[in-house]
């Protein structure tokens, strides 16, 4: 799914974008122009086939007049005896069994004895300053090895790339200086461990009376990152739970209805799932950077609903990560209809503190339209003001920014079928300059929409 400014857009040649799988590209259609003011998020799933994998899922439901229950399970397990991308030797299996979940330990020497072949890059072993190293050799009388070199980072290895040719690259040993490695390659091969992910979920709803609705969900996960090893298995199991209660305070079918809503999410740090739990911009909404620990998301609010006139919702949210984050957010949403007037407003204000930053984030989007029989006119006002400061010196971070935009538009036709709409948008962008948020540019956009 592709999101623009947090909203999903449609895929297709006659819609917003297409995907070229051969080139690995997302191409936006000419009917969906991209500007520098847009935030683009691509949400996708992939699976690496390193072992034969067995996937099983299923579920069941139970329902009565007041109670609904659902149970589902999901399991994906790599067969550790059926590798697809690597042939593991007994020595390499032993390395994996001692590595636990630490990928930095999942490496093995890559040198393999090889007979002389003029079409291959081969190495011999040689003592250099008391260290046994691989040295490029073309002498058929030497004991030769085929060696794979892995990039390990600057000053993390003892080999450097000295020559590239049509057959293969040639690497050369460089002795450490004062104990500091001088290369960025090592004669190792990274081993990939078989994994397991299992999920069990039970959810349901209970309606003890006409005015009360209760929804609940509990899930457990088991995520083993190395089936060859029992080390580090203490963090395999995780739990997540959700409870939502809606209580109708005033309930009349043809009039305004008032409800109170309480919602609680608990997610342990070790809980794993196969897809995201929240919206694509959850981290941006809360100014999250690197949250750690168990998560608690608590919310409470009021919902005012009228069958013909729309709704208004106020919600207070509290988000906590046990090790380094605490935040509170107020949300106000309204979508109302008064004869020919339509009013929409979505605003929020966030205050949070982490071990690194504190921030205040104000957001507001508002739209008012007036409809004629086959025409409409309207205006929009949107603003954001995001100030993030580092705890250590109270300076603004580069993510601090602010904007305001004003828009007017008019259209004719049926906005859900065939229509033409023209409009004008003025936007002012502010960004960080010399530790101050200052105006950096303005834009004026004239547009025509049609269908």
Where are these regions (language model features)?
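Surface-exposed, low-hydrophobicity segments enriched in Gly/Pro/acidic/Ser residues
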Residues: 1-451
């Amino acid at each position: 799914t592709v999101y623009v400014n947090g909203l999903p857009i449609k895929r297709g040649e006659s819609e917003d974008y297409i995907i070229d799988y051969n080139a690995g590209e997302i191409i936006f259609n000419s009917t969906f122009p991209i500007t520098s003011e847009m935030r683009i998020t691509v949400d996708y799933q992939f699976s690496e086939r390193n072992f034969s994998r067995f996937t099983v899922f299923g579920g069941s439901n139970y329902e009565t007049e007041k109670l609904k229950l659902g149970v589902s399970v999901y399991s994906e397990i790599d067969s550790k005896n059926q590798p697809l991308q690597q042939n593991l030797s007994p020595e390499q299996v032993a390395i994996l069994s001692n590595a636990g979940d630490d990928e930095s330990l999942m490496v093995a020497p890559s040198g393999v004895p090889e007979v002389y072949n003029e079409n291959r890059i081969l190495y011999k072993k040689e003592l250099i300053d008391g260290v046994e190293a691989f040295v490029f050799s073309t002498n058929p009388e030497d004991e030769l090895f085929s060696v794979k070199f892995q990039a390990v980072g600057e000053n993390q290895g003892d080999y450097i790339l000295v020559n590239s040719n049509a057959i293969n690259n040639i690497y050369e040993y460089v002795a450490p200086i004062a104990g500091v490695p001088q290369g960025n390659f090592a004669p190792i091969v990274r081993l990939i461990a078989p994994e397991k992910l299992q999920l069990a979920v039970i959810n349901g709803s209970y309606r003890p009376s006409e005015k009360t609705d209760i929804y609940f969900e509990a899930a457990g996960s088991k995520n083993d990152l190395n089936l060859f090893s029992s080390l580090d298995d203490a963090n395999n199991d995780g739990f997540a739970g959700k409870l939502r209660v809606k209580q109708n305070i005033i309930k009349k079918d043809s009039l305004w209805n008032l409800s109170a809503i309480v919602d609680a999410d608990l997610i342990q740090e070790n809980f794993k799932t196969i897809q995201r739990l929240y919206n694509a911009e959850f981290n941006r909404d809360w100014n999250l950077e690197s949250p750690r620990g168990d998560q608690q998301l608590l919310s409470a609010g009021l919902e005012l609903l009228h069958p013909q006139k729309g709704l208004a919702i106020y919600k207070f949210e509290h988000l906590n990560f046990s090790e380094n984050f605490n935040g509170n957010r107020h949300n106000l949403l309204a979508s109302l209809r008064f004869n020919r007037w339509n009013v929409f407003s979505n605003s929020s204000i966030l205050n949070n503190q982490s071990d690194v930053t504190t921030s205040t984030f104000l957001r507001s989007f508002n739209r008012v339209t007036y409809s004629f029989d086959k025409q409409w006119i309207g205006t929009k006002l949107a603003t954001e003001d995001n100030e993030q400061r580092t705890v250590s010196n109270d300076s603004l971070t580069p993510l601090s920014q602010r904007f305001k935009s004003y828009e007017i538009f008019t259209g004719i036709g049926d906005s859900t079928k065939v229509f033409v709409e023209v409009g004008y948008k003025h936007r002012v962008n502010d960004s960080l300059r010399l530790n101050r948020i200052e105006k950096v540019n303005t834009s004026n956009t004239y547009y025509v929409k049609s269908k």
